[in-house]
Amino acid sequence: MLAAALASLMILTSGQDIASTQDPAVPQPAAVDLEDIIVEGRPLENLTQTFVREVAAPARNRGMARWRNGLCVGVANLQPEMAQYITDRVSTVAQDVGLKPGEPGCEPHVLIIATVDASAFTRQFVEVRPRIFRVGGSGMDRGGNAFEAFVENDQPVRWWNISVPVNDDTGLIAIRMPGYGAPSIGVQPSRITTQIVDDTKRAFIIVDVDKTKDVSLEQLADYIAFITLAQVDPEADTSGYATILNVFDDPAQTRTLTNWDRAYLQGLYTTVRRRQNTGAQRTEVVDSIVRAHHRLTSVEAPE
């Protein structure tokens, strides 16, 4: 299994052979959706701030990252038709936020691996290839404690994102990487704005097939799409919101990406990420999500 996954990292395939399979659902209280806010008059900005604060999990001391131009998805250890469905769904959601999906045979940035024992597999994977998870550059991941939680957690799906500070104008890496000299970057001095932003570079997603049996392939693919495109805190409490992130707690309640999810992704990918202060950056994302919400609801409103 591990050998196949490591081979996939280099030549990433769209799959091999294991069926998708999670523990019984736990009922959840009524969740807040965007339409509820309109009906009940609750403050959208406050709810959005809380959602972003709960969900967003950027690298240590960095802003919220996103993919720059496009991404290539590779899926290993699933039947070909299932692997292709997940690949296509993640690529479609990526395209919806303005990213270019990878061509067939592309070198993957996102590795999705299905396994019957995610904990054992992850420990072995990390032991064999530690450097692909902890690259060593400053501000590229959430740190040692988060990495240990990634290895040891018992969730149906676990993930690890790698991002890097870059010059927003050029896309060039703006930090010193292990084994390389310090980068030469020209920036405009300012106390308010910055040219240095964070780009997602890699995502590793490991699916435990024994713990995903109560969700459909469509639900699993949408869940994977969301955690691929955004840096999500695995411990986020989103029980009060209608979001695909709740799918393993209550599969019947969340069938697909919700308006919350779509607004979050659209807001993340349309915001201008130039604030020097990370708190101000997050406020920009919140404002962008609110604008995305207004666009979504205006399109869906009956005439």
Feature map (PLM): residue ranges:
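Bacterial N-terminal signal peptides
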Residues: 3-13
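Boundary of Sec targeting at the N-terminus
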Residues: 15-16, 20-22, 28, 40
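A domain-level signal for the mature, folded cores of soluble proteins
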Residues: 18-21, 63, 67, 103
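Short boundary motifs at domain starts and secondary-structure transition points
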Residues: 27-30, 59-66, 196
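N-terminal secretion/transport leader regions
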Residues: 27-43
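Acidic/histidine-rich, surface-exposed loop or edge segments in extracytoplasmic proteins
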Residues: 32-35, 63-78
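Compositionally biased P/S/T/G-rich terminal and signal peptide-adjacent segments
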Residues: 42-67
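Long, folded non-catalytic interaction modules
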Residues: 74-89, 94, 98-303
